């Protein structure tokens, strides 16, 4: 059954002051490691990693090369007018992605966003329900949703930041295990009630990794489009990265790459040492003993005040 993300404007305006409690006795970080050619390195040990928090070395207490923790995926799809010609491809590729990546104890949900955000399918492990949700993709969300507009009013644009904020704060914050947002868009935001930084903060507080898929319709833009700078910031801050659909990589290829990455992560846990009891954002840096390897992991987390 289709549902809507009905969040009052006042609650979104309050986003900067909202607090999501995080137990910082154990900080969990999921990291993927690639070599210069981009191949994933899957045979490292705990001793190959160094974890720094705010410049202080931390002792790794928990480590796993093959994380069997549940995986929760939010698939967020831009259905603004510039993306109209891509919707049918996204339906097919999205359904195939869920079939490939989801295991029995995993779950996923689907949100479309244009002038408003619409929850097409809530958290489920059912391939049938997820496929049905994807079939609900359509140009803009013109009824209900986050930003209802009176008859005759202009469309508000593409509320990309709001969609990310809501996916993290409303759907992922209470889930356990690994949490991933896959964001398919041309990278433009127009009309969101929250800022780019508020969307990133929401992802941090929910421990969500953002993988952005920069997808533009060549019939609209050629092979140009808007800048992907916002997508890079969201993804890199949370431990993900940006993929570009182009002549060499179609959407199905990129979904396969995302699947490989989330299944190639190391789970690293530590108890923060050498920190004051104050809250706020704490920076994390993860390195390997081999300087030629690239580590992809979130940049930090928000700690509670004791």
Model-derived regions, located:
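Sec-dependent N-terminal signal peptides
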Residues: 3-13
């Amino acid at each position: 059954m289709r549902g809507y993300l009905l969040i009052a404007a006042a609650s979104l305006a309050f986003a900067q002051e909202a607090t999501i409690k995080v137990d910082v006795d154990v900080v969990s970080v999921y990291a993927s490691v690639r070599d210069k050619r981009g191949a994933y390195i899957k045979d490292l040990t705990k001793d190959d990693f160094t974890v720094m928090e705010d410049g202080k070395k931390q002792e790794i207490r928990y480590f796993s090369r093959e994380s069997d923790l549940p995986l929760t995926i939010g698939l967020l799809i831009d259905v603004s007018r510039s993306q109209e010609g891509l919707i049918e491809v996204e339906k097919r590729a999205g359904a195939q992605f869920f079939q490939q990546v989801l295991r029995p104890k995993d779950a996923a949900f689907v949100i479309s966003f244009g002038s408003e955000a619409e929850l097409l399918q809530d958290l489920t492990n059912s391939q049938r329900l997820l496929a049905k949700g994807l079939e609900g993709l359509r140009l803009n969300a013109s009824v209900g949703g986050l930003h209802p507009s009176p008859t005759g009013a202009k469309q508000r644009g593409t509320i990309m930041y709001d969609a990310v904020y809501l996916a993290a704060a409303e759907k992922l914050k209470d889930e356990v295990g690994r949490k991933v947002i896959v964001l398919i868009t041309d990278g433009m935001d127009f009309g969101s009630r929250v800022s780019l930084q508020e969307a990133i903060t929401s992802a941090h507080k929910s421990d969500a990794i953002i993988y952005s898929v920069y997808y533009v319709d060549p019939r609209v833009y050629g092979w140009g489009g808007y800048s992907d700078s916002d997508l890079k910031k969201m993804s890199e801050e949370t431990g993900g990265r940006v993929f570009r659909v182009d002549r060499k990589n179609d959407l199905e290829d990129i979904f396969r790459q995302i699947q490989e990455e989330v299944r190639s992560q190391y789970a690293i846990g530590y108890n923060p040492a050498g920190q004051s009891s104050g809250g706020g954002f704490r920076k994390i840096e993860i390195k390997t003993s081999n300087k030629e390897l690239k580590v992809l992991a979130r940049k930090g987390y928000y700690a509670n005040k004791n």
